[in-house]
Swiss-Prot record:
Binds 1 Mg(2+) ion per subunit. The basic functional RuBisCO is composed of a large chain homodimer in a 'head-to-tail' conformation. In form I RuBisCO this homodimer is arranged in a barrel-like tetramer with the small subunits forming a tetrameric 'cap' on each end of the 'barrel'. RuBisCO catalyzes two reactions: the carboxylation of D-ribulose 1,5-bisphosphate, the primary event in carbon dioxide fixation, as well as the oxidative fragmentation of the pentose substrate in the photorespiration process. Both reactions occur simultaneously and in competition at the same active site. The gene is rbcL. The active site is at residues 152, 271. Its EC number is 4.1.1.39. GO terms for molecular function: magnesium ion binding; monooxygenase activity; ribulose-bisphosphate carboxylase activity. Heterohexadecamer of 8 large chains and 8 small chains; disulfide-linked. The disulfide link is formed within the large subunit homodimers. This is Ribulose bisphosphate carboxylase large chain. The record marks 311 as: Transition state stabilizer. The modification N6-carboxylysine is found at residue 178. GO terms for biological process: photorespiration; reductive pentose-phosphate cycle.
Length: 410
């Protein structure tokens, strides 16, 4: 399974793994074992190998390079033939590529750094339900980032007070407010009550400001059926957008919801709760840029992508790398930004990156410069923490944004 002379095909799915072999295990052996375990191999030779063409179906570790400045760490490049994967299933792709190999004895640690998805495969996915351009047309908002706000305290408000907070923020000038990812349907606020009060707030703010407003109604639930029930109710109320936690909810549920949203004209906001469990470690897990690519294939119109400046972790160049992977059609390989492969999305719509987490109005110049127009800037405490209240907090954010955009345009 270690084939250094292999030339990759345009249809191969390419993976870059950062591997730390156990002491005494040569990197070639570790790379080959990983390629085997995540494709056709098993721990021994079996009779039934003779009944198929392993040359056609096996994953190949075709290049290994040491990581600069690290002891006993290597980047292993593995190519997988397209036939190993079910079309249109992120779930199956991850089950194959990262399903078993991370528990391997020969490896002390393993991290999936990047994936190259060939157009032949990405074309089998729904992708974002609408994409950036359609969203701007639906909202009739152009030439500036969109503003959001997560309603806090995240848990404990009654539905009516929650609706009031939503109204104040939207009335003050925000484009969106957001259910916190933990808000599903708890005893103090059942989902249907929340949806009803929020819809009222939405239409009242819309009527008073003459702008289209949205609130990310969190449809995440314990079962797929319940999730779709909530999305359907949101659509019946006339809400423009719903929300889903794609890692805790799972890719299967997420893709089902994306299909529903596309068919019914709902935008889909994606929250990445649980991502740090998977991507925080430097040498083990899956890098967020892979999770971001997976989301673009599975379907979502917004996704949280770190801030570069707030309370949560994120390095600037690397963050910008996966922001481009979310928005652009064609992204060149660039190792300085952690992009191991050139990625061609052909015509798959883009996803709006959402900057959220510990940012406030003083960060606005930096945020508009870093993220550009196609983004959503979300201030939770940065709106509701205003000493004069929610609406003035929203006004402050909107004024700051307009000022930054005007300064840039002049």
């Amino acid at each position: 399974y270690y084939t250094p002379d292999y030339d990759t095909k345009d249809t191969d799915i390419l993976a870059a793994f950062r591997m730390t072999p156990q002491p005494g295990v040569p990197p070639e052996e570790a790379g080959a074992a990983g390629a085997a375990e995540s494709s056709t191999g098993t721990w021994t030779t079996v009779w039934t190998d003779g009944l198929t063409s392993l040359d056609r179906y096996k994953g190949r570790c075709h290049d290994i390079e040491p990581v600069a400045g690290e002891v006993n760490q290597y980047i292993a490049y593995v190519a997988y033939p397209l036939d190993l994967f079910e079309e249109g299933s992120v779930t199956n792709m991850f089950t194959s590529i990262v399903g078993n190999v991370f528990g391997f004895k020969a490896l002390r640690a393993l991290r999936l750094e990047d994936l190259r998805i060939p157009p032949a495969y990405s074309k089998t996915f729904i992708g974002p339900p609408h994409g950036i351009q359609v969203e701007r047309d639906k909202l009739n908002k152009y030439g500036r980032p969109l503003l959001g706000c997560t309603i806090k305290p995240k848990l404990g408000l009654s539905a009516k007070n929650y609706g009031r907070a939503v109204y104040e923020c939207l009335r003050g000038g925000l484009d969106f407010t957001k259910d916190d990812e933990n808000v599903n349907s708890q005893p103090f606020m059942r989902w249907r009550d929340r949806f009803l009060f929020v819809a009222e707030a939405l239409f009242k703010a819309q009527a008073e400001t003459g702008e289209i407003k949205g609130h990310y109604l969190n449809a995440t639930a314990g079962t797929c059926e319940e999730m779709l029930k909530r999305a359907i109710f949101a659509r019946e109320l006339g809400a423009p957008i719903v929300m889903h936690d794609y890692l805790t909810g799972g890719f299967t549920a997420n893709t089902s919801l994306a299909f529903y949203c596309r068919d019914n004209g709902l935008l889909l906001h994606i929250h990445r709760a649980m991502h740090a469990v998977i991507d925080r470690q430097r040498n083990h897990g899956i890098h967020f840029r892979v999770l971001a690519k997976a989301l673009r294939m599975s379907g979502g119109d917004h996704i949280h992508a770190g801030t570069v400046v707030g309370k949560l972790e994120g390095e600037r160049e690397v963050t910008l790398g996966f922001v481009d992977l979310l928005r652009d059609d064609y992204i060149e390989k660039d190792r300085s930004r952690g992009i191991y492969f050139t990625q061609d999305w052909v015509s798959m719509p883009g996803v709006l990156p959402v900057a959220s987490g510990g940012i406030h109005v003083w960060h606005m110049p930096a945020l508009t410069e870093i993220f550009g127009d196609d983004s959503v800037l979300q201030f939770g405490g940065g709106t509701l923490g205003h000493p004069w209240g929610n609406a003035p907090g929203a006004v402050a954010n909107r004024v700051a944004l307009e000022a930054c955009v005007q300064a840039r345009n002049e």
